[in-house]
Amino acid sequence: MLKKDRKAGYYGSLQAGANTKGGANSSFNINYNSKLLDAYANIGYRHRKNTGYTESTQTSNTYDQRYKADNDRWGNNLFTRAGLTFHASKKDDLSLSGMLMKGKGKSKSFTPYEYTAVADGLTDYRMDRLTRSSNDMNMFYSEFNYRHSFTDRHFLDFTVDYSRWKSDGDNFYRDSTVWEGNDVHAYDYQYRPQHINNRRWEVKLDYENQITKDMKVEAGYQANFSHENTPQESYIDNTSWEGTAATEDKLFYNRFIYDMDLHALYASFNYKLGNFGVMAGLRGEYWKVNTESYTWEQEHDPSLREKPFKKDFFQLFPSLFMSYQLTESQQLQLNYTRRLRRPWGGQLNSFRDTRDATTVSFGNPELTPEYSHSFSLNYLKTWRDHSLLVSAYYRPTTDVIQRISYKNSEDGLFYSTSMNVAKSQSSGLELTLKNKFFRILDLTTSANAYYYKLDGFAYPIDGQMVTGAADDRFTWNARMTQASYCPTTYPYRLPDATRHAR
């Protein structure tokens, strides 16, 4: 934070750069500050260009494959940022800031595949594949902040921000195959537009009070409101290279709508008594999820749509951090936290994707978050030029989200989805040693031993029981990093690592 009694004035900078591949960048920024007002503005431009070439030869007992691929990519991005802070009084600040990004990118790849028959009864053939894509990206972010400072160590902070990400892309895939001795071409044309439209609101209210040198309290409220609406489309043509007779692939179509609202309250208390320090906290979260998934028929006929899938949750997340200063250079730490990992939107989409002829993939709207308890015990020892940190940790997890695959007993097809299937346990020991020698050499050595166990499970799905065997593994690794300093040169690093797993 800038001091409020500084002298008023302007300052700014301008820079530009380029590289040998045809890329370029430039930026300009200006700042103004005074006792009453602070302001800044920035604009930047970046141009990317990349040309690549790939060549490969592969052999098998049926065909030998050879190809030479040409790849071209370029993109332009424009970035702008601006902000304003008004010092309404010695204790009150109001800020408004925002950021915009507008970008466009294109790529092209042409790959001629040549297949030479090795086995009897097969014919040589050639397949040309052309892939083109273009993408328009727009990002917007804005933030309002108000802070009231009772004292330097006692304040109330309120923030509201809004962000939006919108992307419109076009992807074209063209295949042309011709067999030796036959001039008739087989075509496979696909056009897949991609439209992403996400937005999010966040509201935060934070209170902090350093009551004494050894005592501090914090409390706050946070709310997030996110919305995602992403359709999936495809147009196909098997009669021409240009796709002049392309029709919509109705089986591929899907619109997925995902909304999540979250409200959280938290409080924490920090206290130090002699050599003993403690921080205890509690966070309560309530959130609700709403998902909708439409096929092509449901998109065009609302009467066919199923009811949106809705679910809400309330959970408490305690935390406790304790430390004890054994001596001036030795400290013990004991920590505990309860955590969660939520499923991401795509894992909740019930649409059955049949693009892969061997496996039907789909999401599971019934998924719940994973919950884990994390325990750690740390010992820290410091010397003037050296330090040693030894950490032991243990983390049991419930409702583990696992990707499972199974063969349906009715239609004989393979399916893949995500389920909350079992419990897991993670434990380990980590050692970190830092050494400084003669002011010119820094060494960091770390070693980690890690054990993971996943319980077996039996889960009913599609009228049958899907089972999974218990699994466990032990892994260890060690790493050393060196940083050397010379009087007239920059530091350089030489990493070395060893890894082993069972």
What is the role of each PLM region?
Residues M1-T116, R129-D168, D206-E228, S268-N270, ...:
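Membrane-proximal, glycine/serine-rich, low-complexity loop/turn segments characteristic
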Residues K68, R200-E202, T247-Y253, F362-N364, ...:
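Outer membrane beta-barrel strand-and-loop segments of large Gram-negative receptors
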Residues A8, N19-G22, K68-N76, L130-N138, ...:
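Short sequence motifs at beta-strands and strand-loop junctions characteristic
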Residues S109, N171-S176:
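Small-side-chain secondary-structure face that scaffolds active or pore-lining regions
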Residues T239, E370-H373:
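Outer membrane beta-barrel transmembrane domains
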Residues T51-R66, E114-M127, R174-Y189, H227-R255, ...:
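Surface-exposed loop/turn segments flanking beta-strands in extracellular/periplasmic regions
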Residues V217-T327, Y459:
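Signature of Gram-negative outer-membrane beta-barrel scaffolds
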